[in-house]
Amino acid sequence: SVDLTKNAGVRCVNFNEADLITCFANDYGFEKWVEKAVEFYGDEGDVLIVISSSGSSENMLNGIKAARNGNLKSVITLSGFDEHNPLRQLGDINLWVDSRAYNFVENIHQVWLLAIVDLIIGSREYSV
């Protein structure tokens, strides 16, 4: 998220701060922490990227529901495992890895995220 903000001027935040997760999970329950983060930090017109290896993490599914209720522009999902996982059913753009191996799914997700950043800032940074 820092690369998008710094290099592309795109306001971008991530919800992987330990204090945010701990506070919201303690106060609202683990299943609701992403939902609450989206409610507090998401603005109308934002894009939410949701990542779940299995595509069935309840906290992530609730985050998407909050995005829909908060009028975020779109939801991009990255998942793996079952092709018909619940996460994939809720996104506007869905990237899916055909594997049940966590390490493989997570590594492919990382490559895709880096590719998205490169597509957005690439013309400014690279001559290729």
Regions found by a protein language model. Name each.
Residues 1-128:
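Glycine-rich phosphate-binding loops that contact phosphosugars or nucleotide phosphates
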